Amino acid sequence: MTVLATAGHVDHGKSTFVNFITGQETDRLKEEKTRGLTINLGYTYFEFKNKIISIVDVPGHVDYFKNTVAGFANVDGIIFCIDSVQGWSNQSEEHFQAISNLKITNIFFVLTKTDLLDTSIDRGFLEKKLNSNKLINYTIEEFSYKTSDLRMFQKKIVDFFKSDTSENPNSLWIDRSFTKDGIGKVITGTASMAFDLNKIYLARTNKLLEVKEIRNTENIVKNTTTTSRIAISLKKNIQDEIGRGDLLTNEIVFSGKYIFAITDKQASKFNKKGSNRLFIGTKNQIVKKLEVVNNSEKNLIFMELPNNLPILENQKILIQNLVSNEFMGGKIAFASNNNNLVKKFFKELRKTESINLEKTFTLLPENLIENSRDYINIANKYLSKDRLESIIKKINENIETINS
């Protein structure tokens, strides 16, 4: 299975294209049908020559942007719709910035409504914009609901997304929960490629999930080797207090409200003024405090959140400045709930222009070190050999005091 999400400005034909390609409507809420507007996430799929393409249809309206980003969690790529009459619009740019900063690099662009006479899409502008980002792999296709060939489009999508380049830690971020008669509580989400369906923890509690049944599309599954849309029916005793924003993992993880993250661009250029929102998987929180860490090796930022958040190292994140609407992407380095450690960190930060992370934290995750050969692995954290020798020397010098 390959899992894709849609993207694009409101009323640029995302749901219409998904309806064409799958034969199914994704707008299921009464308000969505009345207004002709996608509000929440929709889900569907199609099959082509034994290949399943699952699609998460996201809202295009700016008011539902939090729902939009939730739909991007763990997907393999994007179907990006652009109205050939209106051209590149506000939410086109907003969605593109979010996708780019989340490092979702495979994008299938669809120029919609090409049967209308007054089309005005500037294809040269689009290609120039895309070619300026060397990481993006893209194609641009023209689409008309009246004249386009269904099987041809299905084949183009399957062929384009043949190679999986997604890099996500073993996870499933829940994007929907509901109760179904005769089954009980059901949760759904996009499982990353290596996610083990036989050992699932609810990260918020670090307890094994008691599962009744797991399905993808219409089939019961025991495990998966690809990114997959998964529906999990739960046993009765854990049916409450679980829903969108919860993280499922294959290991016990740490929760913290002090977050250190490696950014993809120079963090000092990011506008921190005003409110910032952190998107992580299908979860989002307003950031209480955001600081740029001056460090010679990494583009590092520190965030204080209002609430604890389960943390997976190398989890992709997106930060949005709600004043300037500027975006910054990155990956989680590590998290802590230790207020004293954070105080020590900022004390060191005030004393120097470029902080030495090793001296401040002693143990570091692998993604914050330059050369693992110079470090000792201790419980999946790294300590430099020089620092270890220094610690051993101090212990030996004070051995009598320690033993007294």
Predicted region positions:
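C-terminal effector modules of nucleic-acid-centric enzymes and ribosome-associated factors
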Residues: 6, 106, 116-122, 128, ...
